């Protein structure tokens, strides 16, 4: 991912009320660090590593779960061999202890404080991450995607005159933010204050809020710190101590940054350029983008590339797709034109055979009239009466004897 090329090599310095006429509507050169490649992979990795360095070691008590004189009852008692609490007269007596599967027992693999809490990160990688985060602050799309309200901001990157560093009161700081169109983002952070979910609210982390603008100043000991530090969501940082945790909170690129003129002019000397190494960071040169122009279609269709590209090859030979004529009728019809006629004749013969069979069955199934049905029923009843009269079972007292005699 490459930051979009700067449309102008100059950035306008936004003047404030009360500035001298010489300080208003001036311009500064855009430093090369603002056009460096944006590497979210490096930023995410470095942020995840250095954020571990502020962790406080924790562990469970070494005595937890073992503050009882439990002993195993051994075998032959029809219970498990887990250690059990001695004594009697209480529910606790006889209960299992010590094991991680027991109520009141220790946890599995109790945590220790000698865990490797901190992470070491290569110096060059940390510098690349900060450079990428700085470059992302100049891309309005990334800043808006992060959720900052910059609709009323006149220009990105946003640079204000050095008179902002002399602001002492918070009311004056709010006035400055309103003049440059950045107060909407600070207001968003203020309105987002809420109570933290979970147990963190009991541990001095009760309130959470969104991030507002980051004010970067260039004068050591400037009064601007006291003016802006009490605004919710607004953070401050000296240009020589830029921190990735502030430039890309959560590892997410696109923090809304307000630069003072003096801080913006120092970026070139602190981070150097693509050809000239940094004056403050020994031997550091800005990373170059793999593609100077990210518009690949424009590069391919340019006259320089098209003049040396080989023409499109025509008449390429492709393998013939062979189909089985025994399974594919269209292929069979191409190979044997008579197959279509033979297929039709077989279908007609089958249809005529089915029709003849149906007619034959209908002819055999003679329709019986109502009178004939009544005559058949009467004949059946007469035959039944004859069978009863001809039998001599009434002469036997026991019907089963008649059955035996008849057999």
UniProtKB/Swiss-Prot annotation:
| Listed GO biological process terms | translation
Q: Could you tell me which InterPro entries the record lists for this protein?
A: Ribos_uL4_C_dom (IPR025755), Ribosomal_uL4 (IPR002136), Ribosomal_uL4_dom_sf (IPR023574), Ribosomal_uL4_euk/arc_CS (IPR013000), Ribosomal_uL4_euk/arch (IPR045240)
Output the Gene Ontology cellular-component terms: cytosolic large ribosomal subunit; cytosolic ribosome; nucleolus; plant-type vacuole; plasma membrane; plasmodesma; vacuole
- GO molecular-function terms, A-Z: mRNA binding; structural constituent of ribosome
Respond yes or no to whether keyword Ribosomal protein is given for this record.
yes
Which keywords does this chain's UniProt record carry?
Ribonucleoprotein, Ribosomal protein
Region: Disordered; residue ranges are 57-96
Q: Do you know which PROSITE patterns this protein is assigned to?
A: RIBOSOMAL_L1E (PS00939)
Q: Which residues cross the membrane?
A: none
**Superkingdom of origin organism:** Eukaryota
Q: Which family does it belong to?
A: Belongs to the universal ribosomal protein uL4 family.
Q: What is this protein called?
A: Large ribosomal subunit protein uL4y
């Amino acid at each position: 991912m490459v930051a979009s090329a700067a449309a102008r090599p100059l950035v306008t310095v936004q003047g404030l009320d009360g500035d001298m006429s010489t300080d208003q509507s001036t311009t500064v050169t855009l430093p090369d660090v603002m056009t460096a490649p944006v590497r979210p992979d490096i930023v995410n990795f470095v942020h995840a590593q250095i954020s571990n360095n502020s962790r406080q070691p924790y562990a469970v008590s070494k005595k937890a779960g073992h503050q009882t004189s439990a002993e195993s009852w051994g075998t032959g008692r029809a219970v498990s061999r887990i250690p059990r609490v001695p004594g009697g007269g209480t529910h606790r007596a006889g209960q299992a202890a010590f094991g991680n599967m027991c109520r009141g027992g220790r946890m599995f693999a109790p945590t220790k404080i000698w865990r490797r809490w901190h992470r070491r990160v290569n110096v060059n990688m940390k510098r690349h991450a900060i450079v990428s985060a700085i470059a992302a602050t100049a891309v309005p799309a990334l800043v808006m995607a992060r959720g900052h309200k910059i609709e009323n901001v006149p220009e990105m990157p946003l640079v204000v005159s050095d008179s902002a560093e002399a602001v002492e009161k918070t009311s004056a700081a709010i006035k400055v933010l309103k003049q440059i169109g950045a107060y909407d983002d600070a207001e968003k952070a203020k309105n987002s204050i809420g109570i933290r979910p979970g147990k963190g609210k009991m541990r001095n982390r009760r309130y959470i809020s969104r991030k507002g603008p980051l004010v970067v100043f260039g004068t050591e000991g400037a009064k601007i710190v006291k003016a802006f530090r009490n605004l919710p969501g607004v953070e401050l940082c000296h240009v020589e101590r830029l921190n990735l945790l502030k430039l890309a909170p959560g590892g997410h690129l696109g923090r809304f940054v307000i630069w003072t003129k003096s801080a913006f002019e120092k970026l070139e000397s602190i981070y150097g350029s693509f050809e000239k190494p940094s004056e403050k960071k020994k031997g550091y040169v800005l990373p170059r983008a793999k593609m100077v122009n990210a518009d690949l279609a424009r590069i391919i269709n340019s006259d320089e590339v098209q003049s040396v590209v080989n023409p499109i090859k025509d008449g390429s030979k492709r393998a013939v797709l062979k189909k089985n004529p025994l399974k594919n009728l269209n292929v069979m019809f191409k190979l044997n034109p008579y197959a279509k006629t033979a297929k039709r004749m077989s279908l007609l013969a089958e249809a005529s055979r089915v029709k003849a069979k149906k007619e034959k069955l209908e002819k055999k199934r003679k329709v019986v009239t109502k009178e004939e049905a009544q005559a058949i029923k009467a004949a059946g009843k007469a035959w039944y009466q004859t069978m009863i009269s001809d039998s001599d079972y009434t002469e036997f007292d026991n019907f089963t004897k008649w059955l035996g005699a008849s057999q």
